[in-house]
Curated annotation (Swiss-Prot):
Family of this protein: Belongs to the N(4)-acetylcytidine amidohydrolase family.
CDD domains noted in UniProt: ASCH_yqfb_like
Reaction catalyzed: N(4)-acetylcytidine + H2O = cytidine + acetate + H(+); N(4)-acetyl-2'-deoxycytidine + H2O = 2'-deoxycytidine + acetate + H(+); N(4)-acetylcytosine + H2O = cytosine + acetate + H(+)
Keyword Repeat: no
Keywords of the record: Hydrolase
Keyword Hydrolase among record annotations: yes
Entry protein name: N(4)-acetylcytidine amidohydrolase
Enzyme class: hydrolase
Residue stretches making up the ASCH domain: 7-95
EC number(s) recorded for this UniProt protein: 3.5.1.135
Taxonomic source organism: Vibrio atlanticus (strain LGP32) (Vibrio splendidus (strain Mel32))
């Protein structure tokens, strides 16, 4: 499968990404093919507005129940909020992927 060259985020996460407070994203199986070392163009999900480029550092599988405070800190939110957000986006999911990145 070809590695993706784009990534989208809800607009509400843009400021945290640009400030470096949000350094991971947690995605489902359909978005697990990002390649470490690649650079992706990032846009808002709502309007498709490009706002930065990110270098992918790693893509690691994780189960929903294994998410912890460290992941929440990297997402710049509390663990309870992180779990609620994930359940809103991916209801009932157990297998997830942590995509680590840095702003370029």
């Amino acid at each position: 499968m070809t590695a993706p060259t784009t990534m989208t985020f809800f607009e509400r996460f843009e400021t945290d990404i640009l400030s470096g407070k949000k350094t991971i994203t947690i995605r489902d199986e359909s978005e697990r093919n990002y390649q470490p070392g690649s650079v992706v163009e990032v846009s808002t999900l709502e309007q498709g507005r490009v706002f930065c480029n990110l270098k992918i550092i790693s893509v690691e599988p994780i189960l929903f129940y294994d998410l912890g405070e460290f992941h929440a800190q990297q997402e710049n939110m509390t663990l309870d909020v992180l779990k609620d957000v994930i359940q809103d986006i991916y209801p009932g999911i157990s297998q997830l992927y942590v995509v680590s990145y840095e702003l370029v």
